[in-house]
Amino acid sequence: MSHGGKRRSGDGGSEGSSYSPLVYLKRPYFRKSRSCPLAQCPDEDIDYKNKVLLSKFVSEYGRILPSRITSVSARKQKLLARAIKRARYLALLPYC
């Protein structure tokens, strides 16, 4: 009995090739590296009193944005987190 469906070529036929979705991606395991937006900024500029700079790295809900979103280096992310927490403690930035 036939199921009524048409058989497509490449559905595991006898060609010996298997389907791989990675064939259709340009570069499957390649991530484009982005430079740190604070690379030109010295460490002294990342300060708890600099509300304009700190507010760029805080979400609308008051949470610190992760470095995978902001593409900030690990060192600058640590300095930013410390400055944001100090600014929150001194009521310069909101907690939420």
UniProtKB/Swiss-Prot annotation:
Chain's role: Binds as a heterodimer with protein bS6 to the central domain of the 16S rRNA, where it helps stabilize the platform of the 30S subunit.
Superkingdom, natural source: Bacteria
Organism listed in the record: Anaplasma phagocytophilum (strain HZ)
GO biological process assignments: translation
Record text on subunit structure and interactions: Part of the 30S ribosomal subunit. Forms a tight heterodimer with protein bS6.
The family this protein is said to belong to: Belongs to the bacterial ribosomal protein bS18 family.
Annotated stretches, region: Disordered: 1-20
Keywords on record: Ribonucleoprotein, Ribosomal protein, RNA-binding, rRNA-binding
Xref: InterPro entries: Ribosomal_bS18 (IPR001648), Ribosomal_bS18_sf (IPR036870)
Protein name, per record: Small ribosomal subunit protein bS18
Gene name tied to this protein: rpsR
Gene Ontology molecular-function annotations: small ribosomal subunit rRNA binding; structural constituent of ribosome
GO terms for cellular component: cytosolic small ribosomal subunit
